[in-house]
């Protein structure tokens, strides 16, 4: 089933009552998902909240609980979501949300007291309060704590006319969490060229939160020992913000972007094993900002003995030719056996640059561009009056180690942000500043 068909099926639930409550089945799911978003839950939990009751309608032949929905709807729903291609972490939570109810019926007298008449009746059909052995098994489940959170949203999602995102808000999120979120044609392009442009990976509505978090980081003061702000000095003595690094722990929105299951699954697919975040940066390229010289990333990523990286660029603002969008060399895929002529600063030589056809990759806000560490790339100056902000997150093979903290510790020592620099000390950028216009 396509995501469009799933959304249409959910939309039809607007006329199906949620028994014993003043909401429809659709409204109940939307409210549960909205509560998950407000709680800062991971995307797979948000989708589990949206879809936790699909088992009530996905199998017309299911046994019924005397007008109270399908018997075993949690298992039916989990099987259905797995069958239509959603990632297993979603179906696992959906399959556990009735166990959470049965657990709370034993361990929380107040919870049991507040159950509606309909919920009390369905509890009987669902096996009643857990036995001691069932309690132990459920507590040992890897989804135990998340299932309890899901249950709390389930119980609270019964308000008349509550504020919450509408159904369309979840379209892009659902696509991201499909096992086939990348098509065979896209994988073929990746394998042939080492890069991939995925349009509309995040919706305009979703990008509101990302843009707000980026605005917040942009306005934050320079603080030693925390987020790392780097500047460029162009034709005047005025410093212009060029880049921020090491910000994952300071903006929760970026936690899901960089380490949530959807993007880790995508990066793992492209890297051919589990991916681990190596480093993150925001390139701002404000109006008048300088370009980035042509280079490959691989020569700059040798510090920790890793052999292969993939970078995910999320376009926060639109990227155009006028504001200096990313440009990629159109060439068959390169690897460590392909030697390109470089300058001493590890940028590509004029001869190497002239040997490629450079393709501007214009992007809309919410698009991804992914490229491996051997893809030659560059960008031009921003000659427009609008910014071209973009998130760049680089990943390595998890088997080669988790080096994010060590990377930023070494960079802070060798090439610190302005606020941490000592007067009279000459900082050589080396591998920490290849091809970019950050001031020395």
Summary of predicted features, one role per range:
Residues 217-220, 226, 368, 375-440:
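Non-heme Fe(II)/2-oxoglutarate
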Residues 1-181:
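Metal-dependent phosphohydrolase cores
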Residues 181-192, 198-294, 300:
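Non-heme Fe(II)-dependent double-stranded beta-helix
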Residues 49-55, 292-299, 328, 376-379, ...:
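Histidine-centered catalytic micro-motifs
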Residues 273, 299-306, 315-325, 331-333:
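Active-site region of the double-stranded beta-helix
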Residues 303-321, 362, 370, 394-399:
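Short, conserved beta-strand element in jelly-roll/cupin
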Residues 105-107, 162, 290-297, 304, ...:
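A short secondary-structure junction signal
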Residues 319-380, 400:
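Double-stranded beta-helix
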